[in-house]
């Protein structure tokens, strides 16, 4: 296989802020391609400062291991993921991009879309939400009114959380989902969640710190709304821990290291009775297209990266 890559840095339509106060105006990412004969597969790895992942560090790893990445004799994507997992053990973002490109390449070689390779049929697919980042209440209302949508994910974790939802609810009957990004204490969550339920919120994503399992166990028993794990469920090893602490999991392809482990996480979550969501890390159309092929297997989806970014780099979604 032949490896190529391209760094990109796409502006957000609006500055994007979450509960820890981080604000982003651009999303840097690395696009990768694997070429074999007349076929080419594409993948994407967003650079996330919170995880100490930069475009520059990913490029350095690609060049360091280029020969090993290219020499693999492709027979099936799962084998390539295991190979990459050992070759790049500390870089799940880059493994994800290469795994994504491999599945895309393999599907083109077989003449099948990814969802068919996963033996699913294209029916009953959920609609993505549209995320509204933390801002002043007036600006959050303006963002929502500028983008009419049936499902909104609203970032919370402020002193004004209830006022934010009350203000937004005055302007729409759309479905609301709340993402606290681990920004609440157990006491705050116990106080806020019943109020949010009365305002028509559908579920809460990651209310507490990722390692606050004791608090989550209490919240799981008391919450009138379903609770979804994000930061608490990064890899395959985390899925089982979420039982009796969360009602569902939000899988991020980038964080779990790709399509291959995400397939296994979904299978395990179904066996354990957990609801399943796949979430975005502000990927462009390239990474979002990979998420889209999982839609028939999901209860919910958050793949709004192309809606949040001000520029498009690909077509097909």
Regions found by a protein language model. Name each.
Residues 1-12, 24, 37, 279-317:
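Flexible C-terminal active-site loop/helix
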Residues 31-32, 38, 98, 111, ...:
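Conserved, mostly hydrophobic/aromatic
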Residues 211-305:
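Catalytic alpha/beta core domains of metabolic enzymes, predominantly
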């Amino acid at each position: 296989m032949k490896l190529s890559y391209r760094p990109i840095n796409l502006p957000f339509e609006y500055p994007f802020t979450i509960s820890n106060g981080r604000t982003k105006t651009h999303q840097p990412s690395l696009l990768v391609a694997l070429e074999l004969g007349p076929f080419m597969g594409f993948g994407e790895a967003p650079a996330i400062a919170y995880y100490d992942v930069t475009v520059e560090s990913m490029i350095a790893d690609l060049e360091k291991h280029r020969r090993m990445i290219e020499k693999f004799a492709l027979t099936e994507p799962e084998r390539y993921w295991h190979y990459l997992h050992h070759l790049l053990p500390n870089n799940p973002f880059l493994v994800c991009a290469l795994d994504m490109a491999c599945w895309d390449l393999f599907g083109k070689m077989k003449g099948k879309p990814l969802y068919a390779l996963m033996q699913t049929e294209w029916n009953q697919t959920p609609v993505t939400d549209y995320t509204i980042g933390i801002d002043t209440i007036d600006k959050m209302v303006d963002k929502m009114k500028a983008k009419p949508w049936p499902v909104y994910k609203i970032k919370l974790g402020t002193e004004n959380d209830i006022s934010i939802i009350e203000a937004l609810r005055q302007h729409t009957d759309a479905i609301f989902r709340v993402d606290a990004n681990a920004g609440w204490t157990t006491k705050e969550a116990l106080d806020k969640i019943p109020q949010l339920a009365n305002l028509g919120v559908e579920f809460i994503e990651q209310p507490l710190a990722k390692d606050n399992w004791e608090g989550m166990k209490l919240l799981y028993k008391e919450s009138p709304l379903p609770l979804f794990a994000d930061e608490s469920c990064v890899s395959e090893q985390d899925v089982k821990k979420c039982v009796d602490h969360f009602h569902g999991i939000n899988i991020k392809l980038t964080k779990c290291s790709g399509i291959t482990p995400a397939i296994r996480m979904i299978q395990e979550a179904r066996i354990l009775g957990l609801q399943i969501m796949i979430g975005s890390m502000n990927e462009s159309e390239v990474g979002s297209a990979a998420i889209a092929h999982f839609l028939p297997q999901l209860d919910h989806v958050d793949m709004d990266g192309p809606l949040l970014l001000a520029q498009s780099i690909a077509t097909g979604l």
